Amino acid sequence: MSVSTESTLRSTSAPHELDLNHAEKLTPQQHGDSTPSDTMPEGGVAAWLTVTGSFIIQFCAFGYSTSFGVYQDFYTREYLTNESSSTISWIGSVNTFLVLGSGIIVGRLFDRGYFYWLLWGGSILTSFSLFMLSLAKPNQFYQIFLSQGLGAGLGSGILYVPSIAIVSQYFRERRALAMTIVSSGSSLGAFLHPLMLNKTINGSLGFANGTRANAGLISGLLLVSCLIMRTRLPPPTHVPELGRAIRGIVRDYAFIFASVGLLIFAIGYYFPLFYLQLDATTRGLDPTFAFYTLVIMNASSFIGRLTPGVLSQYKVPVGNMFAISSGGCAVLIFGMIGIKTDAAFVIFGIIYGFFAGMFVALLGPILSLLTEDIKELGARMGVAYLFTAIGGLLGGPINGALLTGNLVWWRPAVFSGVVTTVATVFFCAMLVVLHLKKRTTPSSSRLTASPTPMEPIEQSHRSQQSTLRKDSYTINGLLPVFWFQF
């Protein structure tokens, strides 16, 4: 296809229907690659080793962070008994905030070609912080906060965005498969880390040796990632200005509704993740069973993350799935008030894990839907994740304060249920704004990229007009992590 044809297509494309799996065809220079876009390796030793390294980083970074519920339980009952549950939750909240919130800065550094600096720097900081955590003494809150909250959180945050972004340098047609493998690392980590931590710090090894064992595992895996991951493209000659993207955000009401909704939703979303195991333990359930509540929830979350990709093949609207998943989480959090038996905890863990995993899987697609200029996608995702991180930072301490030292469980459950319900209203408002914007967009300007790389884009434009009119929100390729194309 000629350059002039590409320019015409870019000028007439509707921003919300751009297929992310094929967007690179339209703007190959955006990544600083001077070679034709059809020269993506789509495999090979270097590509799959990089995917393996990214999988490992997700396992060690976000997979570890989402296992904080084990520490919340252990610190509250045994190791930090002089601190309230609200104070203790600041450790996990700050850790999560840094993992997600640092992306707005780390992403810019990655765009400028500092991948290896970020990879080695984040790995060293994470390893050092976890070994320092093993030296923390009982009832010394500041030692644990500095090592686990700040150190490990910042180290994981430095690794998180680059481990996802690097995969796009090797894959286009098989990017969905590659990204699915990478994203499953965090789910596997959220499943296995609680098992290991409960068996070690609550077992014969104790806190110090158990933490060292976990730190040794993570350090060894991160070293493997550093040795096998490689970049393919040179640093780009031009990086889009962050200020221009932010100015566009201020005028985008749909994105504002989404960002505010994410901030509010995150305040309540992490309540079950941080407190479910402590809830099960303090209600007199068998300790061995209580240790598995997080494992059950995270195993179900893995299934929930795969579900949107399956439903999208049946043209289920992305926006509808997003609102339903947030609403499902809200209803289930209210349900925490009544769970008191083993069976109730199992049922809650399975259903909440499913909806929570589904919500996380849809974050990327819904943010892509809200991005008019594909070159601003990274900046907009950074802003949205920063809002999410702020909500996660506030949620743990607020819920801990409502819980009080007397463990009054209905208070944080009601509060978290209310805020997630309010967030769902914001997400519905976002969909209404998108719908109104669709109605004011001339149908002649709507375009999606070719569904298969072998068909001309012009033919796809003619054949997909009727599909776009029937389904305004289902967008082929907006689920790059879970949409399998071989």
Residue ranges of model-derived segments:
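Intrinsically disordered, low-complexity terminal tails of fungal membrane proteins
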Residues: 1-44, 432-486
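Hydrophobic core of transmembrane alpha-helices in multi-pass small-molecule transporters
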Residues: 55, 59, 129-130, 141-158, ...
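Extracytoplasmic gate region of multi-pass secondary transporters
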Residues: 60, 64-75, 194, 247, ...
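Intracellular juxtamembrane helix-capping segments at the cytosolic ends
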Residues: 68, 75, 149, 156-171, ...
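Helix-to-loop junctions at the C-terminal end of transmembrane segments
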Residues: 101-115, 304-318, 403-404
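Conserved MFS/SLC helix-loop-helix module at the cytosolic interface between two early adjacent transmembrane helices
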Residues: 101-142
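Structural signature of the two symmetry-related core transmembrane helices
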Residues: 117-131, 319-335
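Helix-loop-helix hairpin linking two adjacent transmembrane segments in secondary transporters
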Residues: 173-177, 181-233
